[in-house]
Amino acid sequence: MLRDKLKLLQAQIEQERSKSNYRVNEVKEEFDKEIQKLRQQLQSLEDEKKFLVLESRGINAVNQRIKTSPPEAFSRVSSQHRALNTPDSSHIQEHIPKKRKTEISTQPSIVLNPNRVIKDEVSAFFDCLYVHRIVGVELSTIEILNCIKFEHIDEFNYKLLKINKDTSIGSGIVDFLQSCKKNMKLNELVDSVLEHLATLIKAIIINDQELNFSVPFLVALMVQTILFRPSAVSVNSLKDLFIFTCDLIRKFQIVLKKPLHKSPLEVDLGPQIFQYELIDNLILVYSFDLLESTTKVIRIQQLSETLYMEFFDESLMKSLEAVYKLTLTISFKPVINVIYSMVAVFVTITNIMNNDNLSKPFGSSKWWSDLLTRLYQLLGKRILNFHVFDDTNTNNMHIDRFFDFYSLLRNMGTNSVSPLLAQLVTRGEIKGIPNIVLKDDIIDKYESKKEKGVLSDNLELEKWFVYLKDDILSIIENLMGYFKKDSKITNGEILINLTKLISVEQSQFMDHLIDQDTDVFAVRMNLVEHALSIIYRMWKYYEENITQESIKEVESELVMSLWRIIVCKHASKKICKDDLMEHRILINQMENLHLQDTIDLYEDAFEDMPEYIKEELECSINNGTQQKMQVQYDDIYIEMARYILESKLTNFISVENTDSLYLSMGF
């Protein structure tokens, strides 16, 4: 069925492409005809003008000779005048070449198809860095750096970048960019900027007395540098940047080592200042953005297998292992911002391994098995939209209130902390110490939202958490595709953890999500279907790696989850159109409005809208309504669930339960 759908979709795409090509060719032919017609008209007008100029000059010459000639020459002049109209006249042969030599055309040239003027990429890169602004911050990044100076470093001097103690870091960077702008190509400039900024960050961090005030904004400029033109970054620079970022993350690992629960003996008697903690949080999150960006740029460049293996060598994988063990922690409080970036890094790396069919993996199967163990633990966390900011229960996914700022790559959260970044500096004043920011300012914001019962931000965060779990499923799927029957990767743990995931999500459907007019339901449905497809693939192709003990551990949950998927198809047949119309008004009102807009669009395009279009629109909106009522999955996933139950589970289920199961399946 999937192949038929794909073929039908490809045929529709090919038909649309042929229509668009025919339309483009037709417009181009009409345009060429108009141009040719205009050219012919211009040529005829120019010929007519030349003829009139020649004729007027000939007449003027004859009149001049008549005025200066003696009377006895009148007869000769008149004969010459008559000869002007004769093609064989010797007068024309004598004077016309001279007139053509002195003629100057005043007709302006018209460029019918001007060439596109390509903007100077180096200047565009300079402008991009100069106007870069972090989302939610009032000042640009360069403007913030213009207010920051060294506090204990007397002078920084590395190649082309020179910064004195009394001058701002931003002015030094701008001078450096302007000096490089004149005599460097884009790829040279990008590598040079990354090298100088990384060296500057190292100099600040190595000095124990120097504050890290400027480091997060320097890291933000590095992210913008490699994202401006990914193809301009060399592979060697990317590898150095990857290792540098891993070292930077390990330098600030203390931020990731917060205890799961607050000690009852701990008493907060000190001042509730937040500026130094905020700077460390920014450095950590932006460093993970830099790590994620570097990995994605490597994927975009589509290197050969040899270059991939040289990039992801043993030393780099060791650095990456140390970073993911800090991020996907079990003993400390998780930070969802950096976990998201870490998972995105592994999605990209496993895509390279699986889709490029590499002969050797990046790391052994044992290396990846240890990673999966930590991902399974993250996959088991519950997602509740009314607990997204509650960090007291670590079994639920949540975002720390003091990490609630947008990263450089995704806008996750409410971004309540980002406006405080502009308060760290004072305009028109250069300082090496940040201004005071209090924790109470952030706490008061969330208490106010809690009292007002704001839920929209929570729903957005809920979707982000579901997307995170879906990315983890993509990692599992990629590793299954690459390692195939390796029991360290493809084993019963996949069945156990994904079955629990489906069971928990289906419970969430019944407890909180059914009959809610929100698109979170569709996102969660896609997550369940993705998990089911992996279980189906595991069951069909790698069944020898599934032990009986693994099946027994989740037998009841698996049977119940699959039964809920299968029985939905039979339940949906009992709902008539009138009932669906009533349900649609109650629980699918936004889709109902979207349907009405689509109908209005078709009515504007057609005098009488075809019946098949009406039926398709009604069918799509009814399917969406049934999904929100949890009474319908896609047919392909229903068949997957049926296959699993029919093929193998009957060996582990009693006869009575088997009869009930077949009855519910429609047999």
From Swiss-Prot:
<dbReference type="GO" id="GO:0005634">
    <property type="term" value="C:nucleus"/>
</dbReference>
<dbReference type="GO" id="GO:0006325">
    <property type="term" value="P:chromatin organization"/>
</dbReference>
<keyword id="KW-0597">Phosphoprotein</keyword>
<dbReference type="GO" id="GO:0000077">
    <property type="term" value="P:DNA damage checkpoint signaling"/>
</dbReference>
<keyword id="KW-0175">Coiled coil</keyword>
<dbReference type="GO" id="GO:0005737">
    <property type="term" value="C:cytoplasm"/>
</dbReference>
<dbReference type="GO" id="GO:0006281">
    <property type="term" value="P:DNA repair"/>
</dbReference>
<keyword id="KW-0227">DNA damage</keyword>
<comment type="function">
    <text>Forms a complex with the serine/threonine kinase MEC1 which activates checkpoint signaling upon genotoxic stresses. The MEC1-LCD1 complex is recruited to DNA lesions in order to initiates the DNA repair by homologous recombination. Required for cell growth and meiotic recombination.</text>
</comment>
<keyword id="KW-0963">Cytoplasm</keyword>
<dbReference type="InterPro" id="IPR018622">
    <property type="entry name" value="DNA_damage_chkpnt_Lcd1"/>
</dbReference>
<protein>
    <recommendedName>
        <fullName>DNA damage checkpoint protein LCD1</fullName>
    </recommendedName>
</protein>
<comment type="subunit">
    <text>Forms a complex with MEC1.</text>
</comment>
<keyword id="KW-0539">Nucleus</keyword>
<keyword id="KW-0234">DNA repair</keyword>
<feature type="coiled-coil region">
    <location>
        <begin position="28"/>
        <end position="55"/>
    </location>
</feature>
<keyword id="KW-0156">Chromatin regulator</keyword>
<dbReference type="Pfam" id="PF09798">
    <property type="entry name" value="LCD1"/>
</dbReference>
